[in-house]
Amino acid sequence: MPLLFLERFPWPSLRTYTGLSGLALLGTIISAYRALSQPEAGPGEPDQLTASLQPEPPAPARPSAGGPRARDVAQYLLSDSLFVWVLVNTACCVLMLVAKLIQCIVFGPLRVSERQHLKDKFWNFIFYKFIFIFGVLNVQTVEEVVMWCLWFAGLVFLHLMVQLCKDRFEYLSFSPTTPMSSHGRVLSLLVAMLLSCCGLAAVCSITGYTHGMHTLAFMAAESLLVTVRTAHVILRYVIHLWDLNHEGTWEGKGTYVYYTDFVMELTLLSLDLMHHIHMLLFGNIWLSMASLVIFMQLRYLFHEVQRRIRRHKNYLRVVGNMEARFAVATPEELAVNNDDCAICWDSMQAARKLPCGHLFHNSCLRSWLEQDTSCPTCRMSLNIADNNRVREEHQGENLDENLVPVAAAEGRPRLNQHNHFFHFDGSRIASWLPSFSVEVMHTTNILGITQASNSQLNAMAHQIQEMFPQVPYHLVLQDLQLTRSVEITTDNILEGRIQVPFPTQRSDSIRPALNSPVERPSSDQEEGETSAQTERVPLDLSPRLEETLDFGEVEVEPSEVEDFEARGSRFSKSADERQRMLVQRKDELLQQARKRFLNKSSEDDAASESFLPSEGASSDPVTLRRRMLAAAAERRLQKQQTS
């Protein structure tokens, strides 16, 4: 639990802290020297001093010859309840100076991530050890508090040094141009830390034996934890240095690294779990702040052990399936392929061949198959046995870590979940406390639940269409309604799952009913240009019809496209959105009907005005329109026959 208010507190610099600590130590030494050099000042003070100095008989014999000795001053400082904390602060200051010296010699300037890790590690350690001292041990005397503070000061020094070595090793291992001197300095520091852990074990056995078995168990667990962490980093470093000095590619490196991490992490988790169980049984297991903190840590450690074992089972299953199904590539296949591994971009002296024909390193392929069961290059689905069970277990592991599972090879996300499960078992604390569970589930499914807004879909569709202008907009939008992801829709386009029509099909699909009205005025216009004087009425009416139809096309086409973009698709999965789309469509149809009615009325009035003087008897506008269209059709047929 990071203490944010402590992190934001304006702490002094190391130079200022060292100066203040030195002044405090100097002041306490002067005060103790003055108190010890005044035996004649009061009758009561010499009695106390002689009582405290009974093991040293020569001391009272010459009190004024050379003054009090350094040992007497040290005993006086340790016996005083205020001055002893100055000594503890001085010890902490010395450890910080040693750590600063080690940093300058071994590491140099620290990176931002290393500083943040050290800060988090330090405040977490301080918080949990404060709970341990005053909540679990419930110490009553100043001597016990001082002893535990000095013990934990040495432990936090070792923990921070090991954490810094681990971060620096991870940084140096990814740099191919790191000199061997840097590796040598870090490895030498790790060996020194391991020897210091052996010294801690000796102190633990001496001090813990005199204070009881529980104290011995607590101190042994703490020293074992830091020893295992140090040994873990040393083993990883040895494997890395062996790989650097090994000629060619070391295929077995991944296996050694995995089993080293597995054994060390499981050992650490088991030790920490038993240590917290011991704290819970030793301390007050009833309702208290310390018990709640220990319960939370126990729950976290238990889930970590489960997750690590589940991951190991998945690893064994992947290795078994890979060795049984994918054969090792022959030298001829490696020579024909003559390519680097697509995962690590390193040359391949040995590789495994997938059914699709692609070659990968054994360790690279194993790491990939732990996360996904498809080819890393072509995304071909690999029919591995128990594929569904592996996917379910992998999704369960991701839900524990609040991660999103990788999409399947078909490119369609089945179910993306972010679940948060909280369980409180009150019976483990007190019989009268209730037990309850709370699960917060955020699910995005095709049949699901709240769909993404149309503005987001349109923005994603325009983004994809900028990359693939040949794909129609409505096809992109329909696929986005299913995938809800720009990446998956892009993969579907690249892999051919979206059938891209010819360019002429786009205009037909967007406005299929507008082609015939457009052809009609053009044909009438051509006929009007070649018609005789006796056919003057169609000549006068055809431009008007063309303007009318062009106006209708201009009015209908943008509205349909705009309406298509606004609604997102032809059919929505949400009932509210469908109702809103129907109401919107109804209003648009009414507006279009009014426009057509007004255009038709104006056209009929103009036709009646032009036909009444010439026709006389036939005053029906519908009849006139039919005759005009029939004459135009006859002329079109005649023109086609003559041509």
Swiss-Prot record:
Mutagenesis or variant effect for C364A: Decreased palmitoylation
As annotated in Swiss-Prot or TrEMBL, what is the tissue specificity of this protein?
Widely expressed.
Entry comment on modification after translation: Palmitoylation of the RING-type zing finger by ZDHHC6 promotes localization to the peripheral endoplasmic reticulum.
Q: Which GO terms describe its molecular function?
A: BAT3 complex binding; identical protein binding; protein-folding chaperone binding; protein-macromolecule adaptor activity; signaling receptor activity; ubiquitin binding; ubiquitin protein ligase activity; ubiquitin-protein transferase activity
Sequence intervals crossing the membrane: 82-102, 122-142, 145-165, 186-206, 215-235, 276-296, 429-449
Per UniProt, what does mutating D346A do?
Abolished binding to TAB3
Q: What is its main location?
A: endoplasmic reticulum
Its EC number(s):
2.3.2.36
Show the segment(s) annotated as Disordered: 39-67, 504-579, 596-624
Residues with the Phosphoserine modification: S516, S523, S542
Keyword Ion transport carried by entry: no
- What residue spans carry the Acidic residues bias annotation? 548-563
Q: Give the record's GO biological process terms.
A: endoplasmic reticulum mannose trimming; endoplasmic reticulum unfolded protein response; ERAD pathway; learning or memory; negative regulation of canonical Wnt signaling pathway; non-canonical NF-kappaB signal transduction; protein autoubiquitination; protein K27-linked ubiquitination
Keywords on record:
Disease variant, Endoplasmic reticulum, Hereditary spastic paraplegia, Lipoprotein, Membrane, Metal-binding, Neurodegeneration, Palmitate, Phosphoprotein, Receptor, Transferase, Transmembrane, Transmembrane helix, Ubl conjugation pathway, Wnt signaling pathway, Zinc, Zinc-finger
> Residue ranges under compositional bias (Basic and acidic residues)?
564-579
Cite the domain annotation text: The CUE domain is required for recognition of misfolded proteins such as mutant CFTR.
**Role noted for this protein:** E3 ubiquitin-protein ligase that mediates the polyubiquitination of lysine and cysteine residues on target proteins, such as CD3D, CYP3A4, CFTR, INSIG1, SOAT2/ACAT2 and APOB for proteasomal degradation. Component of a VCP/p97-AMFR/gp78 complex that participates in the final step of endoplasmic reticulum-associated degradation (ERAD). The VCP/p97-AMFR/gp78 complex is involved in the sterol-accelerated ERAD degradation of HMGCR through binding to the HMGCR-INSIG1 complex at the ER membrane.
Quaternary structure (record): Interacts with RNF5. Also forms an ERAD complex containing VCP/p97, NGLY1; PSMC1; SAKS1 and RAD23B required for coupling retrotranslocation, ubiquitination and deglycosylation. Interacts with DERL1. Interacts (through a region distinct from the RING finger) with UBE2G2/UBC7. Component of the VCP/p97-AMFR/gp78 complex that enhances VCP/p97 binding to polyubiquitinated proteins for their degradation by the endoplasmic reticulum-associated degradation (ERAD) pathway. Interacts (via the VIM) with VCP/p97.
- This chain belongs to the protein called E3 ubiquitin-protein ligase AMFR
